[in-house]
Amino acid sequence: MAQPKGKYMAYREFGLEPSVTYVEACRRLRAAFIADGAYERPAKPTGQMRDNASRGNFVVLGEDGIKRGRAVREHWDKMRHAEEAARVKLPTRAERSGYRCRADTIAAINFCLGKGEDLPGWRRKQRWELSNIRKLLEPENERLRAARPSPQHVRRIAGEVNLALLCALVDALDWPDVQLPYKFAAGFESVGEIPDSHVYRTIEPTMDEEAFAELRASVDATNDAWLTEVCSLMKRRAKQARPADVEAMRVLKEKSDAEAANGLCSGPITLNQLRRKYTRQGKLAARVQPRFAAWQGRAGARKVRAIDDGLMSRTNEITRTRETIVTPSPEFPAHVVDELARACVARGIPIPDVELGLDDLFAAYRRVPTAHPEYMIAAVWDLETAQPVFYEVYGHCFGLVSSVLNFNRVPHLLCVAAAMLFAAPVDHFFDDYLTMDLAAGCGSAQACLDALHNAVRLRLEPRKRKHSAAVHRKSWALSATSRTWLPIAWYCSPPRRSESRTS
């Protein structure tokens, strides 16, 4: 549910009343938006494709009001079977994937069509307005920082985040996740009860509060024994490691050291240092996450992804959530083209060519600060010392249930803000952004998405940017989005990925 208009709830989370300057900044943001409307929280889809009797993707409601299944059963007469199949209307793209473009995406598409060749110039003016609003809010940013001083680990990764502009975006959009800016000052709950952001699809917890509290207490009571078990496990794995496993351990240590050098986590500490720092009244008040390496790609282009085992550590078990994320379909560009074609038919105009830009949010989960640093400790085996070492992650470990929810709240807000401010049809798959644009936009939608991230100081990764173009190759797909006189987008695996699947 959206926050009540004009309540400035994100700002008030800091315990302050909005100033005249802040109210004016929100007013200017609202005036700059291309449309008005409350965000609709995703709901659980009803029916499944196999439900052919009364609901599901293969059931249609006829003009006579009778529901009929679209699935065609086998028939002894093959010609009759073929004739029946030819008359069946296949599910639409939205019905197949369960994904539909959000209202802000559709508004952006229609606005782009209205602007046409003037789109790049209009977006330049919008960027200028955002820049002016950001400058107007700088004193407010200092005021918010003073009202809620951040813990040291939060300051290290989120000390530069523009809290005032995040608040203004949330309040101007009437965005339901009113606590998001505050969490960048205080840290996000990562263990235990994870507050509902009101952005994603609701789910019912599987355990009541009393039983959950007992479970968490019982797990926390084993912290010391668990640390000993992790050390033994890592020593045993190192002793039994094959050459490929040894190489993975080496790369894993290098990646962890690189994150420490980039200020995303502490440098490695020893077992004794860990115990001294986190022992409270004779008990260990920390739960470590064993970090392991997952190889990705083929020989010659393989890389290691560091994964922290929240399942083995039981950290995920003591995490209680009330919502689950809803990711976009991999066919997002095709969904946008479908909406574009529909809008063009309604206007009676030709369908223009489109382009796709790809971006990546730098450091992803590591940029979202945790409120539970004692649970964000990754254990890594050091081949040189033949001992385990530990890294204190300031953000979120990769492998925790809470990491997924807390991180995705950030790009989700910024996608909607980009659509409303810049008419940029954009969605994200975790930390990967897919930005659609008219060819007439000359890549300005992607440039505006970048400008928005720079303004809130959660910057994108320039090295991973794929500039707006009609054809893109990425590790998981190749898409062609030009020639939209036919509303089609093609997706296929790159040759290297295809070879690995068939080998």
Model-predicted segments: where are they?
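Reverse-transcribing Pol proteins
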Residues: A107-I325
